[in-house]
Amino acid sequence: MRYLVFVKQVPDTTLIEVDEQGNLRREGVPSILDPYSEHALELALNLRSEGDSVTVVTMGPPQATAALRRCLEIGADEAYLLSDRAFAGADTYATSRTLTAFVEKFGECPDLILFGKQAADGDTAQVPAEVAEMLGADQFYYVTKAEPSGEGFEVVQDYGDEVRTCRAPKGSVLSVSEGDINRRLPSIERYLQASAMEIKVLDRIALGLGNFSVGNKGSRTKIVRSGSVRSERSCTVVDGSDPAKAATLIRGLF
């Protein structure tokens, strides 16, 4: 089995800044492997058996290799970085087009394609569905568990108020929620192995993409404004022994 996991390096969301065009300003902001991506990687590693492989891929600047290196430390078998100045400013559509191009260049279709359910910096949760649509693949959201079953996979989807068990054919796209997936800690030996592993870099030309189909030029949407939302809450304590005050408060609510 070949498992393909798309991951993302995200800035520390507590230190995020936004430029005048509404794009995230990543320079100087500490970055981490997106926690949702790690859930997807862990599920792929749990599925992997002898003879299987887990490939991780991310689109980003050169420093995104740190997230891929972390994936290799956790247990991934190989890693690819999709990096090109032309990719900058991509919306979810242009990002999905780039990731889809990688799948099409990957050779034989992966048995399963996995994403985190969303990214901590954008929270759109759109890319998995868009990639599935572009590939013509089945897509399953809120997956907490998966295991091989016959010619495909049995996946569990947790919607909060409802849990479903479905049959997913090979080549499906999964959006993975945390569920009961246990995080693993890499050994010292694995750290050393991962530090010596090659991270392959592919640019726009290697993926066969035109300059106007990627990044800001290939985006279908434009960010008008982006920023942090700050909320303040106040609390009013009403003495329950004073019916008049309680009545005044209730009238104020309506």
Describe each PLM feature range.
Residues 1-18:
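N-terminal nucleotide-binding beta1-loop-alpha1 segment
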Residues 2, 51-55, 78:
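Residues at the starts of beta-strands that form the adenosine-phosphate
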Residues 8, 25-37, 239:
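Short, glycine-rich nucleotide/cofactor-binding loops
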Residues 37-48:
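Histidine-anchored nucleotide/phosphate-binding helix
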Residues 65-98, 102:
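A glycine-rich helix N-cap at a beta->alpha junction
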Residues 143-254:
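Electrostatically charged, flexible surface regions
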